[in-house]
A protein has these predicted regions:
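N-terminal leader/transition segments
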Residues: 1-139, 147
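Gly-rich Lys/Arg/Thr-decorated short loops/hinges at beta-loop-alpha junctions or inter-strand turns
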Residues: 59-67, 81-90, 173-186, 241, ...
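Generic secondary-structure signature for well-ordered alpha-helical cores
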Residues: 81, 85-93, 112, 137, ...
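Conserved alpha/beta enzyme-core scaffold
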Residues: 82, 102, 114, 120-219, ...
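Short, glycine-/Ser/Thr-/acidic-enriched flexible segments
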Residues: 101-102, 125-126, 150-151, 170, ...
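A glycine-rich phosphate-binding loop feature that marks nucleotide/adenosyl-phosphate handling sites
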Residues: 102, 278-291, 324, 338-339, ...
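Conserved phosphate- and dinucleotide-binding cores of soluble alpha/beta proteins
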Residues: 199-200, 204-287, 292
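Ferredoxin-type iron-sulfur electron-transfer modules in oxidoreductases and energy-metabolism complexes
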Residues: 291-319, 329-330, 334-351
């Protein structure tokens, strides 16, 4: 079998030197991978179909969301300027990054200037795009992933294979074995046992963190509000416990108005995991106010281009509408068979 090697291209629309055929052949020989993929993607795909059937106007909502995103893409410069002004008016700071290296450098500089040592991260696909963890670790910072799936991958020295469920390629038995070796435990492959161990260890990390880094599902240009949806409490802890909160987001995540958020919330969880709404929906507008009891004292938003403006003027323009629900992965027979790693990029699948 061929040795698998990737030469990555940081541009969103670029093509790296990757042999999909060899990677797919490698994946096809992994019985545990096949079990994990079919179990998870089947569940999410069926869940999406069932819950969308409960929303009679689902196609109208999708069309409305498409119109909103098309408006943003047609006037992106205007909305970016409006968003930057709104964040500043709310007490936050906006930073502009053309490349992945610039984004990583900006975040490292913010951390150095504030004497940051420990950083907790909530799930962020853009941070995978920029290889942020590797960059920060090389600068001497301690970085801990706090999304359960990402935490498992960090312990395993692995990478995500799905944009919503990053550890979808591992079975609970494999995760149990990993935890037992990493933490010197004798756990059973019971989800409640595994999450209890992770919760206990991550709680300590939140208490000691000097900085929290998150992504953004959406960002409202008129108010500067960051919208973050999660099914775990890690997102809220990452944004409220550490004194410094850094948001790393692609420039395409903007929506015009805070009033547009419900349109996308009706779609995102339904399409991603078959839920009417995620467990947590966080709306963050600026740093902690004088009368507020929680929240970061500083809010920094790093807006990343990394090929997005080039995509805007290309045949790939439509990809910038993507809301990262992952439904295309869950329903794709190729992805269901070979998984995300076979594609060789940060964003796998058939979009």
């Amino acid at each position: 079998m061929k040795e698998l090697a990737i030469v990555e291209n940081d541009q969103v629309t670029g093509q790296g030197a990757w042999d999909f055929g060899a990677a797919a052949e490698h994946s096809l020989g992994d019985a545990a991978l096949k079990t994990a993929l079919l179990r998870a993607t089947g569940k999410f795909d069926i869940g999406r179909q069932e819950i969308m059937a409960e929303l009679p106007e689902s196609e109208l909502v999708r069309e409305k969301a498409r119109q909103i995103k098309d408006d943003v893409l047609a006037h992106l410069d205007t909305y970016l300027a409006r968003f930057a002004d709104s964040v500043a008016a709310a007490g936050g700071t906006v930073h502009w990054a053309t490349t992945t290296d610039e984004a990583n450098s900006i975040i490292a500089q913010i951390a150095r200037e504030r004497g940051v040592k420990r950083i907790v991260k909530s799930k962020s696909m853009v941070s995978e795009e920029t290889h942020l963890n590797k960059s920060l670790l090389s600068e001497g910072f301690q970085v801990i992933e706090t999304d359960l799936g990402e935490y498992i991958l960090q312990i395993a020295d692995d990478r995500p294979s799905h944009i919503v469920v990053p550890v979808v390629h591992k079975t609970k038995e494999q995760i149990t074995d990993l935890f037992n070796r990493a933490f010197n435990k004798k756990l059973s492959p019971v989800p409640e046992e595994l999450t209890a161990v992770a919760r206990e260890r991550l709680r300590e990390e939140f208490c000691r963190a000097d900085m929290g880094i998150t992504g953004a599902n959406f960002a409202a240009a008129d108010t500067g509000t960051i919208v973050q949806v999660t099914n775990e409490g890690n997102g809220r802890l990452s944004t409220t416990w550490p004194p410094v909160h850094v948001v790393l987001m692609g420039i395409e995540k903007l929506i015009p108005r805070l009033a547009d958020v419900p349109v996308f919330l009706k779609l995102l969880a339904r399409s991603a995991t078959g839920q009417p709404l995620t467990v947590y929906t966080n709306l963050i507008t600026g740093p902690r106010g004088h009368s507020e009891g929680d929240g970061a004292h500083e809010l920094h938003v790093v807006l990343v281009d990394n090929g997005r403006t080039a995509a805007l003027e290309s045949r790939y323009r439509e990809v910038l509408r993507c809301i990262r629900c992952g439904a295309c992965l869950n329903t794709c027979p190729v992805y269901q068979t070979v998984g995300g790693h076979a594609y060789g990029g940060v964003y796998p699948g058939p979009i």
